[in-house]
């Protein structure tokens, strides 16, 4: 396996109420994981029998599924599936991620390339999400092994690796499935704890999807429409796009959300692309009749059943029932700020101020108590938060504010 820190349901949606649930939840839950959670939550409210088919995890103690809650969405960039099997060659090719032999020899990692923290306000009528840049340099929390600091996206892979090494030493006869299951559980616990420590808020639920799940989602949707401010080309991700409004097939969509090299703001621009991808999916579901097409709905739900993992205590039916009143006007995206760029241990990283981040997150999630310090900071030695700073503007950022058909242009 790779070393540490390497860099389902069915029903038509004919009624407007059902369509509104799905679209609103999609936008609120954001990016790759969000698209899958949306479909599950929106339709599972009407199709009770299919809820238990979603993969579940006991990595955290779940919070409530009704009322105010914090949800972490994780997109895992791994060349392996949940059982530890190497991804099919057609997906590796689409990812520009080498081949099966390279993965078997240790290529790739288990980084959380997408981390989005969502707060659902009481009553479910309002939601706000913070994208967490993957290169933020942080202290880890809940990780196994000697590495206790690094980029925030590495916390998952570090714990996964050392958990598997520990288990191999204890019982050399464990199967690949058993190692992968326990390793991923350790990774999830570490990723959640590290985000809690950085942001100072408790996470009630999480949802996780892998690269193969993203690819299959884009395939079922038939690709997405996006808009770029400038032409771009990157051999590492396979991105090669002209400027302007354009349709991306599934392979191109993967390159679009994975590119970081050659972008003016690197990983921050990639974060904005992930947000733009969400907008594109939302627009597509709104306009092309996907949610009224039983065949497409069943295909989307099949992707959810196969590729989505949520915490075992998240009652998606209760969650969906609360989200019925959410409108797109009450859904906002923001990106956690950075202080600048640094090279640490040979890695390009974002310098961050946890105290300032905690103040921003607390003031946004709990505005009625914004003068108070965050009460749920995780981890020893957490610093007293600085006074709140200006919150970044909403929506995908990083370029001229232009759009076509509701889809913003990004770098």
PLM feature segments, named:
Residues 2-411:
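Non-catalytic, solvent-exposed segments at the cell envelope interface
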């Amino acid at each position: 396996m790779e070393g540490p820190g390497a860099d389902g349901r069915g029903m038509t949606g004919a009624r407007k109420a059902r369509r509104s649930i799905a679209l609103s939840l999609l936008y609120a839950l954001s990016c790759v994981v969000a698209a899958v959670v949306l479909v599950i939550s929106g339709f599972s409210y009407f199709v009770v029998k299919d809820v238990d088919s979603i993969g579940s995890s006991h990595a955290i103690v779940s919070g409530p599924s009704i009322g105010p809650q914090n949800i972490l969405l994780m997109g895992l960039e791994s060349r392996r599936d949940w059982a530890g099997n190497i991804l099919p060659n057609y997906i590796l090719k689409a990812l520009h991620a080498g081949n099966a032999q390279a993965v078997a020899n240790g290529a790739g990692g288990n980084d959380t390339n997408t981390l989005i923290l969502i707060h659902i306000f009481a009553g479910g009528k309002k939601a706000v999400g913070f994208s967490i840049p993957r290169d933020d340099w942080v202290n880890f929390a809940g990780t196994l092994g000697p590495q206790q600091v690094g980029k925030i996206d590495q916390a998952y892979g570090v714990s996964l690796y050392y958990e598997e090494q520990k288990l191999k030493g204890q019982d050399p006869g464990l199967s690949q499935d058993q190692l992968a299951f326990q390793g991923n559980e350790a990774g999830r616990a570490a990723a959640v704890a590290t985000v809690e420590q950085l942001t100072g808020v408790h996470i009630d639920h999480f949802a996780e999807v892998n690269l193969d799940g993203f690819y299959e989602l884009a395939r079922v949707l038939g690709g997405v429409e996006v808009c770029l401010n400038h032409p771009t080309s990157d051999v590492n991700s396979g991105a090669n796009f002209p400027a302007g409004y354009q349709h991306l097939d599934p392979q191109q969509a993967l390159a679009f959300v994975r590119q970081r090299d050659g972008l003016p703001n690197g990983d921050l621009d990639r974060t904005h692309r992930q947000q733009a991808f969400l907008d594109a999916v939302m627009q597509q579901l709104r306009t092309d009749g996907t949610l009224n097409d039983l065949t497409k709905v069943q295909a989307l739900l099949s992707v959810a059943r196969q590729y989505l993992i949520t915490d075992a205590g998240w009652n998606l039916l209760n969650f969906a029932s609360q989200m019925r009143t959410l409108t797109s006007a009450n859904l906002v995206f923001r990106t956690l700020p950075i202080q600048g760029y640094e090279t640490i241990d040979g890695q390009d990283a974002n310098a961050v101020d946890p105290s300032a981040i905690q103040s921003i997150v607390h003031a946004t999630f709990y505005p009625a108590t914004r003068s108070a310090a965050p009460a749920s900071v995780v981890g020893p030695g957490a610093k007293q938060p600085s006074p709140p700073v200006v919150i970044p503007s909403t929506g995908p950022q990083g370029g001229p504010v232009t759009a076509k058909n509701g889809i913003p242009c990004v770098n």
